[in-house]
Amino acid sequence: MTKNIYFNDAIIGNGKVTVGLDRRGRILRTYFPTPDFKSQISDIYVAFKIYDETEEEEYIHVCGEEYETEYEQKYVQDTNILKTNMYILNKDISIIQTDFIPLNENMHIRNYEIKNESNKKIIIYPMLHSGITSSIYENSSSMFMQDAIIHYNHRI
């Protein structure tokens, strides 16, 4: 039996923008302007480049299985806000990922809170790989502005 990698463990939305996520907080699909429209995002991977006191660099993929990680995911009561808590056991780093869609805006917002619970001094740089769905008509695109990535569809 094959594993269904597109199983939604959580869904957030506002009636126009709908986002499906897995249990680790990875975005599986994003729909706009209706929940049954084609998905706008093909894949998004978030990683953190970490430098420690010994100048060794490491990569921690937040939604990956590279390190032994405990996950806990829950909605903030009576909201469309989803919090995914991640604790990387052998690195003593905790990450809170917050996803939400404002009720009157056509956007998905994601925020990270990172806490170093070890005695080592570390420097963290976020990294993002993002792919958008497109076709021969090139109707989807993206741009970076003020520490944010914006995906958009020309025809909507």
Residue ranges and their predicted role:
Residues 1-156:
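Terminal accessory carbohydrate-recognition/targeting modules of carbohydrate-active enzymes
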